Amino acid sequence: MTANTTAAPALHGAGAAMRLIVASSVGNALEFYEILVYGYFAVVISKVFFPAADEAVSLLVTLGTFGISFLARPVGAIFLGAYGDRKGRKQALTLSILLMTIGTGLMTLMPSYGSVGLAAPILVIAARLLQGFSVGGEFASSTAFLVEHRPDRAGFFASWQWSSQGLAALIATGFGVLLTSGMSAEALQSWGWRIPFAFGLLIGPVGYYIRNTLSETPEFVEAGAAHAPLRDLFIGQWDRLLLTIGAVAASTSSQYILVYMPTYAIRELSLPQSVGFTGAVLAAALQTLAVPFVGIWVDKVDTGDDWRGDLVHGHRLSSLRAARC
C-alpha cells in the first residue's frame, strides 16, 4: 500500500467526525452550489453568452446547455467510481473536486459573446461537460467515503450529503437575493453574475486541501483494490443498480424544482427576482436542518447488515432526500 491508501483509526471524536463530514461533503456542496448558481442566473447568463432576438429562445438554449452536463454525468460516475474502486476513495475525491474547481473557474472567467463571439457559448458547453463529468463521480464516492469511515452511524454521516446541498442552496440563493436586490440589471449582466461563481472558485482549493489531510477508509484498505468493478457491478449487483437508478432519478428530479424556482417566478409569474430567491431560501433551510435528523432515525431503525450495503449504493438513502419536500 502507498501512503495514500493508509487507513486512519476510526474517527470517533467530535472534532475528527466534523473534519470527516466537511472533507467529504465540501465537494458535493460545491457541485450543487455551482449548479444552482447557473440555474438561478440563467436569465442573465442567456443574455451574456446566448443572445438572441427572442429572449425565450435565448433562455431555452441556456437551459439546454445546463442539461448537456447531465450527458457527462454517467460517464463521470463510471470513470470516477471505477477509479475509486481501484485507487481508493480519497484519490477519486481529490480528482473530482479538482475537476469541479476547473469547471467553476472557467465559468468565472469566461469572456462574453460580445467579446469573443461564437467561442463563448462553445466554452460554456465545455465547462458544463467538465462539471457534469466531475459531479457524476462525486456524490457516490463521497458518500462511500463517509459510510466506510463510520459504518456504525452510516445514516447520520451520509445524511450530511443532502444537508450540505441544502447549505449550498442557502448560500447560492443568498447571493441571488443580495445581487438582484442590490444591483442594477445592467451591472448584474455586466459583471455581477460572476461574483457567486468566483466565491465557488475559492471553495475548491480549500476543499482539495482538506481532503488531502484525510486518510483512506479502513474498509477500502482492508478489502484492497477491485480489479473489475464494472463487471462485478453489472453481473453481481444488477438488481441494486436498477433500483438505485430509479430511486435517485425520482428524488433528484424534485431537487431541480429548486433550481428552476427563481426562473419560473421571473419568466412565468412576472415576480421580482428577489421573491423567487426568497422561496428557494426557505426550501434550502428546511433541507439543511431536517435531513440530519432523518439520518439519526435511519440509524435507529436499521436492523440488518444489508442496509449498509444498500446505503452505500444509494437506493435506500435516497429516501432521506424526501425529507426536505
Where on the chain are the PLM-derived regions?
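Extracytoplasmic gate region of multi-pass secondary transporters
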Residues: Y38-G39, W238-Q287
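Glycine-rich segments within core transmembrane alpha-helices of 12-TM secondary carriers
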Residues: S134, A154-T180, I203
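C-terminal ends and interior cores of transmembrane alpha-helices
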Residues: P51, L98-G117, H313-C325
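Cytoplasmic membrane-interface "Motif A"-like loop-to-helix N-cap segments
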Residues: R86-L98, K300-G314
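Hydrophobic core of transmembrane alpha-helices in multi-pass small-molecule transporters
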Residues: V116-G136
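Flexible cytoplasmic inter-helical loops of multi-pass small-molecule transporters
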Residues: N212-P229
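Extracellular/periplasmic helix-loop-helix junction of adjacent transmembrane segments
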Residues: A42-V75, I122
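Helix-to-loop junctions at the C-terminal end of transmembrane segments
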Residues: V75-R89, V291-T303
